[in-house]
Amino acid sequence: MTVQTFTPNQTTTLDTAKKTIEQQSQELTPSGGNKIGFVSLGCPKNLVDSERILTQLRTEGYEIVNSYHDSDVVIVNTCGFIDSAVQESLDTIGEALKENGKVIVTGCLGAREDEIREVHPGVLGITGPHAYENVLEHVHQFAPKPEHNPFTSLVPDHGVKLTPKHYAYLKISEGCNHRCTFCIIPSMRGDLVSRPVGEILSEAERLKNAGVKELLVISQDTSAYGVDSKHSLGFANGSPVRQNIKALSEELGKMGIWVRLHYVYPYPHVDDLIPLMAEGKILPYLDIPFQHASPNVLKAMKRPGRAERTLDQIKKWREICPELVIRSTFIVGFPGETDEDFEMLLEWLKEAQLDRVGCFKYSPVEGAAANDIDDQISEEVKQERFERFMLVQQEISAAKLQKRIGSTMKVIIDEVDEEGAIGRTYADAPEIDGLVYLNGETSLKAGELVDVLIEHADEYDLWGSLVRA
């Protein structure tokens, strides 16, 4: 049994690879204590929820194991973003019930308890997303707290992490105030609730002290941070800090490690972040989901943006910060998308020259308003548009990476094996973007920052050699 993440055709941009509990075995499994199995599905935001639950379980003395048969209880943290994710979650619950029999369900699908009970009436307990205390209450009921010395710490200061030790996700808020017609996140996770700025910065400091070299800032809507508190003043280390994304980014930028922003909704005040990137305070990397370029489709999605104005914005951003890398996601085959709408999207894509792009064929989500829109698109047309879109972007990406050849770039090493090292530049987020291959460099270590001369490129990845002093 592994801690894993399901990667559905969702409109969020950031996905995590499968992570096994074994990777954290020394932190998670000292002897003694009732044994808990754990499966985590979904996006990085769900992964952070899993880390928080696991941290509390370890704090209370529970042992985390990677086998159904060795577990006293199994927790499944579910995804419910689209129908295929729902099915994956239901299948995983069924597998856990078959292999173990004692299952607690949490996460996004947990908000739809009746649907779970209809398929799997034998689950012990169900909670919605970020209901950490309720999860622990269910665990206490079916696997009582182990006895352990409360003065003996069973977890590191930064808590249990399911990512490699050199990078970590930093969730700054929960929920979303938008009502995009393809999305049901607000119905599962509620409206925006921002974490206190001092709490976020304290966590970031603990992660840095634990050896984290890269913070991946995530939420449902990162650029809306602090809207719910009307951007009131918070405090960090005794000093006042305004609770908005610009001020938070400035404070994170003082830590001297990579800070990467994800899920940045295209508000006008995104303009305020670009100078911070130009000054080197945060990485010049903007993950901003435009979703489409046709005004008709954007209106049907209840998304902001006019094609020409967005192009002007992108041009201005690049003038301020020439090193800026823009990642975005798009949906093709949205209900009502005409041939003209799609051609407009392709022309916009050619003009925008984005660096990293994800494209998803529209997939219906139970409860989403888009399901009621007339003129649903056939799967055949969706696939044809998806392939054409990706071919256009592939050519753009290849041309952009060719320009990297001959330059020296800072690379963070992700893994090393007998063939060499693999890393990423500032232009690449873990799991979703490209890689840099260093063939033969077997003496490097994960988390090292090294200078690399770029010597070769394809459509998505780079190859280079280590620059030695």
From Swiss-Prot:
GO MF assignments: 4 iron, 4 sulfur cluster binding; aspartic acid methylthiotransferase activity; metal ion binding; protein methylthiotransferase activity
Subcellular location: Cytoplasm
Domain Radical SAM core: 162-399
GO biological process per UniProt: tRNA modification
Chief location: cytoplasm
Record keyword Iron-sulfur present: yes
Superkingdom in the source lineage: Bacteria
InterPro entries, per database record: Elp3/MiaA/NifB-like_rSAM, Methylthiotransferase, Methylthiotransferase_CS, Methylthiotransferase_N, Methylthiotransferase_N_sf, NA-bd_OB-fold, Ribosomal_uS12_MeSTrfase_RimO, rSAM
The protein's Enzyme Commission number: 2.8.4.4
Family: Belongs to the methylthiotransferase family. RimO subfamily.
Chain's role: Catalyzes the methylthiolation of an aspartic acid residue of ribosomal protein uS12.
Protein name: Ribosomal protein uS12 methylthiotransferase RimO
Organism: Vibrio vulnificus (strain YJ016)
Lineage: Bacteria, Pseudomonadati, Pseudomonadota, Gammaproteobacteria, Vibrionales
Gene: rimO
